[in-house]
UniProtKB/Swiss-Prot annotation:
It comes from Geobacillus thermodenitrificans (strain NG80-2). Its EC number is 2.4.99.17. This is S-adenosylmethionine:tRNA ribosyltransferase-isomerase. It is an enzyme of class 2 (transferase). It catalyses: 7-aminomethyl-7-carbaguanosine(34) in tRNA + S-adenosyl-L-methionine = epoxyqueuosine(34) in tRNA + adenine + L-methionine + 2 H(+). The gene is queA.
């Protein structure tokens, strides 16, 4: 299947640069995955499409302030480090710019020495394995010295970093936000619960591979990045009960979808408490075992994310919906509007 099948024209001015003041005031396109029919709503009206006994599955990962600015200990040369993935203990997979002169043995200093690192290894795609040393707790030091790593297509500075977190973010570890969840407010979640709709949480730590373009013509040859996920016993029990009682499982975001499908594939369509790494790549032809509905933002052309939603709703339905979204001036990408596919 050719990557160009997932291309579409997107005017640059439709790429949202800032979040709306009211999270739930985003627009919501409701897409019927059977017929392709489209309705236009406000996001807070998503509740009218959810039924008692359904379950929304949210990714409770929290974005790290993963961008660090420092210098090489020997020369004082400036470096920028982006934390990608914790390997074990204080060893991290990172991107370093400029990276050519950061080789195994190179020492880096951040915040006047509050945080230090040594390069242990070089990786493909310009990656580096760094081992950090510090006083106290790593994430406290990171909160003091690090900056929020916004996606490359967002050019404007974010006034309030919490707007790039969901209101329910708690498990720190992501290099990017699970953006479908950015539209929910505490008030909307309370109203959803009061209607008898279950809310369950999984964790998937989003890596920057989310933004890595597909660089092969044939998508079957694309290798997905691996990301850490976990599901609790409480969430597994809720989901199995909802499924047994005939309720719908509605994933909030492609990250929740990939977690749910990974686990359902491993347990014959059921859910179980577990943690691990997933590199599942979902594209048309995939048979879904876990989800009945999907809340998602509008994605980049030729991205693995538009391939996933095309697998769920049909490529022609999705490309038509995106054509309508452009015509109707929907806002795209991380700070943009949302789509509900049911």
């Amino acid at each position: 299947m050719k990557v160009d099948l997932f291309d579409f024209h997107l005017p640059e001015e439709l790429i949202a640069q800032t979040p709306l003041p009211d999270r739930a005031a985003s627009r919501l396109m409701v897409l019927d995955k059977q017929t392709g029919a489209i309705r236009h709503e406000t996001f807070r009206n998503i509740i009218s499409y959810l039924h008692p006994g359904d379950c929304l599955v949210l990714n409770d990962t929290r974005v790290m302030p993963a961008r660090l600015y420092g210098e090489k200990a020997e020369t004082g040369g400036m470096v920028e480090v982006l934390l990608l993935k914790q390997l074990d203990g204080d060893r991290w997979e990172t991107l370093v710019k400029p990276g050519k002169r950061v080789r195994p043995g190179t020492k880096l200093v951040f915040g006047g020495g509050k945080l230090q690192a040594v390069c242990l290894d070089t990786l493909e795609h310009g990656g580096r394995v760094l081992e950090f040393s510090y006083e106290g707790l790593f994430y406290q030091v990171l909160a003091e010295l690090g900056e929020m790593p916004l996606p490359p297509y967002i050019k404007e500075k974010l006034d309030n970093p919490e707007r790039y977190q969901t209101v329910y973010a708690r498990e720190i570890g992501s290099a990017a936000a699970p953006t479908a969840g950015l539209h929910f407010t505490e008030e909307l979640l309370d109203a959803i619960r009061e209607k008898g709709i279950h809310i369950a949480f999984i964790t998937l730590h989003v890596g920057l591979g989310t933004f890595r373009p597909v660089q092969v013509d044939d998508i079957e040859k694309h290798n997905m990045h691996a990301e850490f996920y976990q599901m609790s016993e409480e969430t597994a029990a809720i989901l199995n009960r909802v499924r047994a009682n005939g309720g719908r499982i509605i994933a909030v975001g492609t990250t929740s979808t990939r977690t749910l499908e990974t686990i359902a594939n491993r347990h014959d369509g059921r859910f179980a408490a577990e943690s691990g790494w997933t590199d599942i790549f979902i594209y048309p032809g995939y048979e879904f075992k876990a989800i009945d509905g999907l809340v998602t933002n509008f994605h980049l052309p030729k991205s693995t994310l538009i391939m996933l939603v095309s697998a769920f709703a049909g490529r022609e339905h999705i490309l038509h919906a995106y054509e309508v979204a452009v015509k109707e001036q929907y806002r795209f990408f991380s700070f943009g509007d949302a789509m509900l596919i049911i």
